[in-house]
Amino acid sequence: MRRQIESDMATDISTRRTDAVGECSEDAVLGGRLVLRQPRRGHRFGHDAILLAAAVGARAGERAVEFGSGVGAAGLALARRVEGLDVTLVEIDPALAALAAENAERNGLAARVRAVSLDVTAPRAVFAAAGLASASADHVLMNPPFNAAQNPSPDPERRAAHVALDRTLEQWLETAARVLRPGGAVTLIWRADGLADVLTALSAQFGAVVVLPIHGKAGGPAIRVLVRAVKDRSAPLALLSGLALADAGGKPTAAAETVLRDCAALPLI
């Protein structure tokens, strides 16, 4: 699925059919503030998308772009939290991009959120044709594929969404740097054991890095890291106290529920 696409495919897909995704479920997130359709089979969004949205420090009047948006969970959650924010959802799969556009419409966000079917690694001209010119965004958010190729899912949709190819992270960050204005921020979620790879990939064009570890249970190891960095800025790395999703007994923590259910922002902002 990580194919190069031609410029005539880099189009707004809000009117395309969503039949190709097959049977869908409707899932409420953010305490019912969003209800999203997503395929029952293949990749399905989870906590990662909502945590990612909560970590983006966007404000009204700015523009955010989500790379690899799937059905739009993170970008739509961000748009729901930040009134007046313009969001573009970038998704390589036309059927999922169409479903993301449908989700924006169903949740009353279509005036501020649009979806385009576009490969994140497409050339500059293809992005510009899709309304994503260089230095045009204030924020880029992403949840890139991060699983090793030697441990792929047998499901092709899950495999495409989760398995990182050579230089996937570097390529996505290169595109983010191109799309962002000077001083714009990229925010991503990644495996905790891959933090060194993220920091290395960011070092070429980003600085002022902030890292928030995410723990599955209090007292346990981090399972994810949320990372924010600023284009063309230099400042020491800041490592924040981690967020535990559950206490030692497995009960959701109040801090996690505030983000996952109550649409609160995370301290990277």
What kind of feature is each model-predicted range?
Residues 1-29, 126-134, 265-269:
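Short, low-complexity, intrinsically disordered N-terminal peptides in bacterial proteins
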Residues 6, 13-60:
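Class I SAM-dependent transferase core
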Residues 35, 86, 112-114, 207-210:
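Conserved beta-strand segments of alpha/beta enzyme cores
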Residues 41, 166-222:
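Conserved Class I SAM-dependent methyltransferase catalytic core
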Residues 52, 172, 229:
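Residue-level signal for inorganic ion chemistry
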Residues 55-154:
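Conserved SAM/SAH cofactor-binding pocket of Class I
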Residues 144-171, 175-178:
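Mobile active-site "lid"/loop adjacent to the S-adenosyl-L-methionine
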Residues 221-269:
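SAM/dcSAM-binding transferase cores
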